[in-house]
């Protein structure tokens, strides 16, 4: 099923945000809470069973023009249910694309509805599908979690970078594979009641940590050791790893609901970003155990980590022809086992101890015996009581220069016998009296791909037949088939529920598979699976956690009673004086920084005034309160005083009457009049003729604005009537001349207009809460001040921007900083930067904007006068940056823009080298002009050599440019432009000869066997009747491949991407049609061999989103 969605024109953004409710779920994927009809009681009908699955493709054109925060696909139906895909094109509060599967009609479904789905979401790479990013998960959808997916699906920097292949012609392709499964009753499920265990809350992407912590917790000997680590009542859990781990384990043992891990991650010294980074379980396991081992030193539990997890193996090299053997003993806490090419754990151990022969060019230099043939290998001296096996599901693919996940089937037994075949894994020094028979305790699972996914664990805490699945907050009982066989990996075929139709079976590649195994030695079982109870837990820890529980209960009550209270925020003159000119310049006050009171809604307002009297020392009868109001121009001003009748009401009644937004807050301004002795006095009576005005004073010499007070004036009076009072407030002479301006608004632009002092306030449309700014008029000399009047100063304050400038050559380093205005024109900006750099000609400056997602310069620089203002230079989609990059050109930018610069890789015919040349020519030039220019720069094999220009991408030739093609149509940002000499054999090609593409390739190991191209593609002339054997001789000579290596090469003709392997006697000519059009879909001759060539320095890495920060625990 394929859908094309038109770009949204007026799609309204939903009010609510997709963020987890901290009281419900802290899963790795945010959920959207859908409102259900409480009156409806019927449960949704069970789903029809046909079809159970569907692949849905969503094409999103004009992707970069999407201006909504959320964007939905059209609705599609799977299993009788309506679904849609939800994306956040600019990220859901992260710098990654966020993508979810959403229940399309969640708001209209009956009470208690639920559905369960296994699904994968993908962003398709439209240039090379192998680089598509796909993630898989499963979820129980319901009213409280009506969508599920991935907040950090892929970096926005990758998605929006055109060369990566995800955004082509401003179009993005998204795929969803959805299979509906049997519904589980999720929200009524009680893990503790059903299993006796509780789960761990997820901080965003910490399921990898949760699965490890559950595994360690369920090794009782380890848990007991953690409890016995010395801690004190003065330790803070957020600063002490032992105390935080003790606290976590205690809660897992005794809580009735899921446990948070924030204290523990804070004790690691992790910031929020770290907590949301998905790391590697093995890496975290090692770092955590090293930290604990270090903190256990000098305590009663010193050495516990070694006793549990440490084993030893012997590395040996033994000469074959002389009596010489070298051995080295090493310890291990876990073993890394190969998955690729191994059917099970035993095959991995066989490979681990496999003997390598050192001979030929790889002989071993034995001390006293020179170079010798030798055997090299590893054997185990002893295994630990708790054996941790890390399965190498992820590995680096050198051909693709990226990490890949291996989803091959890999089996592991319930009982692992490492004494098999007469102890073939053991060294001669091993203690043969120890029986190395192990029982499986835990299976840690990774679901997803190399770019992220979900982690959970199957554990049997007492080694009984009963398995449990620990999936973040949810713990369920599972059978052995779920814990073992379903975690082997490989492919899973979903059952066909409609046998009457001949539908092909729907296969899911099982992205969920075992990633780490924990085995416990049978002979140590009773010691490891020991009893742990309260007597193992320090008294101070029990007291602390009981107190925590009481505080948590208080918070719960606080939240439960929140609807009974309101918050009153009281602003005073003191607050305005404190804030204006320092923290804020516009309006009067930041209400987040004034005194707030939490008052029961039923409290009489008079009683609240008594609270204020105690707080501020102002008697009740001397207080007058004003209601704040948000005006249509988005300013916020005191609007009117509370009436005597209103003051007889309750706090809740006043809030409801005054607050159209119906939020929990009531904002008030407390008017306090003070006498000559600065003591409070009764406020003057206010009639309908009186208006309350606020005044700010501007000092143009020092560019300072401050609040000087307020006055009650008659609306019929004129500003000139209060000049004396204003001069007194400012500290001016009584008859000082002043200019007055009304501060009207500041969003989206500043509006500040001069007031005619001879016109009444009423005619000036001045009303309660208005702000008047005033200053002394300036002399001619003083008018040269940078901001001579109030409007210019407010304009400056609103638009000032501190811009960091960096050179394009050093895009990570700030060169200098300049304060500019967002209203500065293009010319203003380059003139100021040129002045800073001491550059005479500003037109020789070229600026480049900043990509907020990739944290790099944008690919295209800013054109000469290509933007109106500085603000246009700093905006990137919905983000605003404060960084600009600059470069100094050798010619003026307008002249340069008439030229086109192409980056051409010249492949020399005489030397094994590739040299990059930047060819700069007028845009109307042709490819022939590029070739002529290139000839002046490169060394040719002979004087009459002819050159051609090719378009190469992903190791395939897509095009030979005709010499007449204009270069303005060529884009070297997407493709590699390759120039080379035309071989003589191609010039002399006969009428029956054919010119074919020849590409190098290799096949991926494992079950997929996907073809991967690499190396430099080339053309080859083949003749009628010519066999592969004859062609091979020419290819070997052309590529200078040694006989020994060439003998291992295989040859195949490719059509539609499928190889057909050739024999030496096959006539190659017959496999290829004569065509003049070239493209990746064409036929080609494939050369299969290992890629041993070093990577070219100029080759772009096509897949860089596997970046992963290493795990660090700082404390």
Swiss-Prot record:
GO molecular function: cysteine-type deubiquitinase activity
Similarity comment: Belongs to the peptidase C19 family.
Cystine pairs: none
Keyword Protease: yes
Protein name, per record: Ubiquitin C-terminal hydrolase 13
Assembly information from the UniProt record: Interacts with SIC/RON3. Interacts with RGI1 and RGI2.
SMART domains xref list: MATH
Catalytic residues identified in the record: 207 (nucleophile), 454 (proton acceptor)
Region annotation (Disordered) ranges: 1-51
């Amino acid at each position: 099923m394929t859908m094309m969605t038109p770009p949204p024109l007026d799609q309204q953004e939903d009010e609510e945000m997709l963020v987890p409710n901290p009281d419900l779920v802290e899963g790795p994927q945010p959920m959207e809470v859908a409102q259900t009809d409480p009156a409806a009681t019927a449960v949704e009908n069970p789903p029809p069973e046909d079809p159970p699955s569907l692949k849905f493709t969503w094409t999103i054109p004009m992707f970069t023009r999407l201006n909504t925060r959320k964007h939905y696909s059209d609705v599609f139906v799977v299993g009788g249910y309506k679904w849609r895909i939800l994306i956040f094109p600019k990220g859901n509060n992260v710098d990654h694309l966020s993508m979810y599967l959403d229940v399309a009609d969640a708001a209209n479904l009956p009470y208690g509805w639920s559905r369960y789905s296994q699904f994968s979401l993908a962003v398709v790479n439209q240039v090379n599908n192998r680089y598509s990013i796909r993630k898989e998960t499963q979820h129980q959808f319901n009213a409280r979690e009506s969508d599920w997916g991935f907040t950090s699906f892929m970096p926005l920097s990758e998605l929006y970078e055109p060369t990566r292949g995800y955004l082509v012609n401003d179009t993005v392709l998204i795929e969803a594979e959805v299979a509906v499964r049997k519904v589980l009753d999720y929200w009524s499920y009680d893990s503790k009641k059903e299993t006796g265990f509780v789960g761990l809350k997820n901080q965003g992407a910490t399921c990898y940590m949760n699965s490890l912590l559950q595994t360690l917790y369920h090794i009782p000997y380890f848990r007991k050791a953690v409890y016995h680590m010395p801690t004190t009542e003065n330790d803070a859990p957020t600063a002490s790893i032992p105390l935080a781990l003790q606290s976590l384990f205690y809660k897992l043992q005794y809580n009735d609901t899921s446990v948070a891990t924030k204290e523990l991650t804070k004790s690691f010294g992790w910031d929020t970003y770290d907590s949301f980074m998905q790391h590697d379980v093995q890496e975290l396991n090692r770092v955590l155990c090293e930290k604990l081992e270090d903190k256990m030193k000098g305590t009663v539990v010193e050495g516990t980590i070694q006793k549990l997890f440490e084993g030893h193996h012997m590395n040996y090299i033994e000469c074959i022809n002389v009596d010489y053997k070298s051995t080295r003993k090493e310890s291990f806490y876990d073993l890394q086992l190969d998955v690729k090419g191994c059917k099970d754990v035993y095959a991995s151990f066989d490979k681990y101890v496999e003997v390598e022969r050192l001979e030929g060019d790889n002989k071993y230099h034995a001390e006293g015996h020179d170079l010798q043939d030798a055997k090299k290998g590893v054997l185990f001296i002893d295994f630990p009581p708790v054996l941790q096996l890390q399965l190498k599901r992820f590995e680096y693919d050198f051909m693709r220069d990226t990490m890949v996940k291996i989803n091959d089937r890999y089996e592991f037994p319930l009982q692992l016998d490492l004494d098999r075949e007469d102890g073939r894994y053991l060294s001669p020094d091993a203690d043969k009296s120890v029986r190395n028979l192990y029982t499986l305790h835990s299976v840690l699972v990774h679901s997803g791909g190399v770019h992220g996914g979900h982690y959970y664990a199957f554990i049997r805490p007492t080694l009984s037949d009963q398995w449990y699945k620990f999936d973040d907050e949810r713990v369920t009982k599972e059978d052995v088939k779920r814990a073992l066989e379903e975690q082997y990996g490989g492919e899973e075929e979903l059952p066909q529920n409609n046998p009457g139709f001949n539908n092909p079976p729907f296969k899911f590649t099982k992205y969920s598979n075992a990633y780490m195994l924990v085995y416990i030695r049978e002979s140590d079982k009773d010691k490891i699976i020991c009893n742990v109870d309260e007597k193992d837990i320090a008294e101070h820890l029990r007291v602390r956690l009981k107190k925590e529980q009481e505080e948590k209960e208080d918070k719960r009550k606080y939240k439960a009673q929140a609807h009974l209270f309101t918050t009153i925020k009281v602003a005073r003159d003191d607050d305005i004086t404190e804030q204006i000119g320092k923290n804020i310049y516009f309006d009067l006050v930041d209400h987040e920084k004034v005194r707030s009171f939490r008052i029961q809604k039923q409290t009489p307002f008079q009683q609240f005034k008594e609270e204020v009297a105690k707080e501020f020392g102002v008697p009740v009868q001397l207080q007058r309160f004003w209601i704040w109001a948000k005006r249509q121009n988005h300013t916020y001003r005191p609007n009117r005083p509370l009436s005597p009748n209103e003051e007889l009401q309750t706090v809740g009644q006043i809030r409801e009457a005054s607050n159209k937004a119906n939020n929990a807050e009531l904002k008030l301004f407390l008017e306090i009049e003070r006498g000559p002795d600065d003591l409070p006095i009764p406020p003057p009576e206010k009639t309908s003729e009186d208006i309350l005005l606020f005044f700010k004073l501007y000092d143009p010499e020092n560019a300072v604005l401050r609040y000087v007070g307020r006055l009650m004036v008659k609306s019929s009076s004129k500003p000139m009537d209060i000049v004396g009072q204003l001069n007194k407030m400012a500290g001016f002479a009584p008859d000082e001349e002043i200019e007055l301006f009304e501060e009207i608004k500041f969003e989206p632009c500043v509006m500040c207009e001069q007031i005619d002092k001879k016109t009444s306030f009423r005619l000036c449309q001045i009303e309660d809460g208005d702000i008047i700014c005033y200053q002394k008029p300036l002399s001619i000399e003083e008018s040269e001040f940078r901001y001579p009047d109030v409007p210019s100063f407010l304009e400056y304050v609103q638009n000032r921007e501190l811009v960091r400038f960096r050179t394009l050559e050093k895009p990570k380093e700030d060169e200098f900083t300049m304060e500019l205005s967002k209203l500065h024109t293009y010319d203003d900006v380059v003139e100021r930067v040129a002045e800073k750099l001491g550059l005479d000609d500003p037109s020789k400056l070229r600026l480049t904007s900043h990509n907020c997602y990739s944290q790099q310069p944008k690919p295209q620089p800013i054109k000469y006068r290509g933007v109106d203002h500085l603000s246009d230079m700093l905006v990137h989609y919905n983000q605003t940056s404060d960084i600009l990059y600059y470069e100094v050109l050798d010619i003026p930018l307008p002249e340069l823009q008439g030229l086109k610069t192409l980056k051409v890789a010249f492949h020399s015919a005489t030397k094994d080298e590739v040299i990059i040349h930047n060819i700069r020519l007028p845009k109307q030039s042709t490819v022939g002009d590029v070739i002529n220019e290139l000839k002046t720069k490169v060394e040719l094999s002979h004087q009459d050599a002819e050159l051609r220009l090719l378009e190469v991408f992903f190791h395939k030739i897509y095009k030979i440019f005709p010499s007449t093609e204009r270069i303005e149509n060529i884009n070297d940002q997407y493709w590699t432009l390759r120039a080379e000499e035309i071989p003589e054999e191609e010039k002399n090609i006969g009428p029956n000869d054919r010119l074919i593409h020849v590409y190098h390739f290799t096949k991926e190991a494992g079950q997929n066997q996907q073809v991967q191209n690499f190396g430099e593609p080339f053309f080859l002339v083949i003749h009628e009747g010519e066999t592969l054997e004859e062609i091979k001789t020419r290819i070997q000579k052309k590529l200078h491949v040694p006989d020994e290596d060439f003998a291992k090469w295989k040859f195949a003709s490719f059509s539609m991407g499928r190889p057909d392997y050739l024999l030496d006697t096959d006539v190659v000519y017959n496999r290829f049609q004569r065509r003049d059009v070239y493209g990746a879909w064409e036929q080609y001759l494939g050369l299969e061999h290992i890629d041993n060539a070093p990577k070219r320095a100029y080759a772009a890495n096509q897949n860089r989103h596997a970046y992963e920060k290493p795990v660090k625990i700082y404390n």
